[in-house]
Amino acid sequence: MYNYHLLEDRDVLCIDQKSFFASVSCIEKGLDPLETKLAVVADTKRQGSVVLAATPKLKELGIKTGSRLFEIPHRNDIYIINPSMRKYLNVSVAISKIALRYIPPEDLHQYSIDEFFMDVTDSYHRFSSTVHAFCERLKREIYEETGIYCTVGIGSNMLLSKIAMDVEAKHNQNGIAEWRYQDVPTKLWPIQPLRDFWVINRRTEAKLNKRGIFTIGDLAKYPYKFLKKEFGILGVDMHLHANGIDQSKVREKHKISNPSICKSQILMRDYHFDEAKVVMQELIEDVASRVRARKKVARTIHFAFGYSDEGGVHKQYTLKDPTNLEKDIYKVVMHFADKLCNKQALYRTLSISLSQFINEDERQLSLFEDEYQRKRDECLAKTIDQLHLKYSKGIVSKAVSFTEAGTKHGRLGLMAGHKM
């Protein structure tokens, strides 16, 4: 058992904007987000398009994030609209500016467009008598200035504030919940299934279930050394988190020690393996171009092919010779994908990530590669980059992008994969 008296007990807030995309879209149309049935859909012209957000009233009909357009009932009281990413970003920035009235920038961590952390340990007492009263004040200001409802988790650390918000605050009438170290046995440990916990996926859950671990309490009490032996550093983190311990600080989140450049895509229909390869090539083209724009080369490649049902294939590989050329990356990805992927399966998600960068001019010459040909490939790639920058990303494309499987041209002009 851990001694919580030795741990720092801070006042960390996790703030989530309720049904953010749907709420912003409602407010823009002069509608009440809590009374309107509205869905924000990636592309209203495609029946397989994913629902990005739904208002609470629409969720009562079973439509939620991840549903498909064709699942939404055809009713006159249901609004179906495309996203407006520029508007969402503007509102998100406005909310962050409200938070920054009370704390310095280093005490705020933007977790996503609609969720952020604040460490108010050293500041809340200047504005309110208690942390809870401060949260009420902040929620009220955000609503009055933007029309957005928020839920707030208060915790001794980032982990507890996040789980307090996810598990309890969203269901409380006032939208606020507070979890401290002393609440761990009564609030954290009963959580099940395990995948409802912040850091556990279905695959890890299945492995834990085989060991008789079904609740977070079971995980917290399981011998630490066995978790470490089976799961490595993940096992260490799981045991600490199951006991409510998270020693990361909001301020430390500004220090990016191992940045990566990545791209992922949810496909609009089920793809066969050969079709999925086309989209993967398009994703690789994008990330390779972004690496070149930074004048870097990448050493580590991580990719994933996700099946339409559960599961999929993911692999990480570290190159001996770092690169920023699409053909090098694609060759590595396909080498492993051809061996690991189920050719009869259908695919719905793809992702590619590059990391472990060094400067382009620090790459060592290789005796086993035609450096003259490589220079020509680099010049060609950078020429295409310049054309894309000057005109558009659609000015030069591979033939496969014009096939039925290609998605590049359908995504031109989108921000974060969605319409502006």
Residue ranges and their predicted role:
Residues 1-113, 117, 242:
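Residues that scaffold, gate, or flank divalent-cation-dependent active/transport sites
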Residues 5-7, 14, 206-347:
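DNA-contacting surface of Y-family translesion DNA polymerases
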Residues 24, 321-420:
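Acidic, metal-coordinating catalytic segment for phosphate/diphosphate chemistry
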Residues 24-27, 50-54, 160-168, 232, ...:
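Short acidic, glycine/serine/threonine-rich loops at helix termini
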Residues 111-115, 155-158, 296-300, 345-349:
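Short Gly/Ser/Thr- and Asp/Glu-enriched loop/turn motifs at secondary-structure junctions
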Residues 118-122, 321:
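Short beta-strand-to-loop capping motifs
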Residues 130-193:
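Long, highly charged, low-complexity intrinsically disordered interaction regions
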